[in-house]
Amino acid sequence: MRKLGVLALMVMLGFCVQTFAQTPAQAPAKPKAATAPKASAGAKTGTSAARAYDRALLRPALLKEKAPETFQVKFTTTRGDFVVTVNRAWAPIGADRFYNLVKHHFYDNASFFRVVPGFVVQFGLSAYPPVSAAWEKANLQDEPVIQSNKRGYLTYAKTSMPNTRSAQIFINLSDNAGHLDRQGFSPFGFVDAQGMKVVDMLYDQYGDSGGPDQDQISKLGKPYLDKGWPKLDSIKTATLVVAAPEAAKPQ
């Protein structure tokens, strides 16, 4: 799923040109090399690649359930756990898509394939090629930017073309509002300060230029990543939490 197209981001004062698209050369749609300092490929596999995926994921058009106004998702990763709090009012279309993807375990066993220090962590290419193929063109309409791309906020990756969001997501590692808000990246949730301690530990030493190719991830799945980028961290499970506690606050 190369939904993170070319989104040439001119990250001034310390950032190089980055892109948030769902294609191999973009940033906020496909964070490259999102892994934590781990040595062995086997240790970073997350859930077993042999485990069957939810067959409902092969029919994106049917996954249209409306999300609760607020909900949480617990990510259990090879680096630790963190919780995402979603506010549907910020981006209803994006929140509904995320809710359905998580409900059907789309993100289970997926890798943080792109981690750019001080910029973003990107994920959302399925561990399973048939699932990636099914969601390749399951695009969403763009939404107004109500919340800013501050540290800890989650946003869909997209290309420079309109209406190209699908399933790839990035977490802002710093305040990127000045660069990404005006490009139409609309946050729909956030990771709190405690959870960002885990996100900050995701392996980032492959760099933005030394990470995997998005097309190959889509075609070959998790084995491709485990072989070529064994230190990448991954998501073991992403699970819906019934209610979002009032205490949860953005980073």
Placement of each model-derived feature along the sequence:
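Bacterial N-terminal signal peptides
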Residues: 7-18
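Positively charged n-region of N-terminal signal peptides that target proteins for export
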Residues: 1-4
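Cyclophilin-like peptidyl-prolyl cis-trans isomerases
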Residues: 22-251
